[in-house]
């Protein structure tokens, strides 16, 4: 059974930082590109970031709205993917999901950016 479990969300003030984690099980994690996606009432579902495989030198790609503020990383030995978020803005509020190429999704973790 494939499982993706996100954690690390919560309430943070504008300009603050937060790190999300996602632990995977039930598949060979190191063989899959991983993504972070977020959902909000205002913007709906929005792709955030992608990290590829070791064979691709762990190449990363980002949505324009988060470029320079968010950093995706992975640890294949822990079957985990991370999202470091800096200089958070109210518009970053949403439920953040990790996905394996959009085939499998976690339950999500809520990030609220508010004073």
From Swiss-Prot:
Keywords: Adaptive immunity, Disulfide bond, Immunity, Immunoglobulin. Disulfide bonds join 22-98. GO terms for biological process: immunoglobulin mediated immune response. This is Ig heavy chain V-III region W3082. It holds the Pfam family V-set. The keyword Disulfide bond applies. The lineage of its organism: Eukaryota, Metazoa, Chordata, Craniata, Vertebrata. This chain was isolated from a myeloma protein that binds inulin. Residues 1-114 form the Ig-like domain. Gene3D superfamilies: Immunoglobulins. GO terms for molecular function: antigen binding. One of its GO terms (cellular component) is extracellular region.
């Amino acid at each position: 059974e494939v499982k993706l479990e996100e954690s690390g969300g919560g309430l943070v003030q504008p300009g603050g930082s937060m790190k999300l984690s996602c632990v995977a099980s039930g598949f060979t994690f190191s063989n899959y590109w991983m993504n972070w996606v977020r959902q909000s009432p205002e913007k709906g579902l929005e792709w955030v970031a992608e990290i590829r495989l070791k064979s691709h030198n762990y190449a990363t790609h980002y949505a324009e709205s988060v470029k320079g503020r968010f950093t995706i990383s992975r640890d294949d030995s822990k079957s985990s993917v991370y999202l470091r978020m800096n200089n958070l803005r109210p518009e970053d509020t949403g439920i953040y999901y990790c996905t394996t190429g959009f085939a499998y999704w976690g339950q999500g973790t809520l990030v609220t950016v508010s004073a």
